[in-house]
Amino acid sequence: ENKVQEAVEKWTEIKKKNSKIRLHMIGKLQTNKVKFAVQIFNYIHSVDSKKLAKKIADEQHKINKKVKIFLQVNIGDEYQKSGINKNDVQKLVFYCKEIGLDLIGLMCIPPINVDPENYFGEMNELNKSLDLSELSMGMSSDFLIAAKYFSTYVRIGSSIFGKRS
């Protein structure tokens, strides 16, 4: 899911009936929605600041739950995209570990209309250098290239469900 409110509406009752369901938050997460995100999601793929990381850690502590975290890297250094600059990733990794987050990997969305291969390769190298186990990259249009660079999570919803209206 990429919207907290939609996930809460769609999945709260379903998750109560089936505790094995694992939900992934893949969209931008605002700090005012963290409480609900931590309650419903098992994975958050879009952490991009100390402020957001701290808020997640605080909410997890309140309800005694651990959410698996990916840091979102703005790998193409695009001003219009969310994500931390690749040069600042190591500091945020250390901070997340220091405050007790279950940081498992990095996530990126490369620039559109550009061959993503170099970006995926760079993300794979960065992920390995930080000794993280998971890599969230690749969408319906480029997931095969992402898999070549060891992506462990791909976002292919539009291939399955069609484009959002």
Residue ranges of each PLM-predicted region?
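Short Ser/Thr-rich beta->loop micro-motif in glycosyltransferases that lines
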Residues: 138, 158
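Conserved alpha/beta-domain cores
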Residues: 1-133, 139-141, 147-149
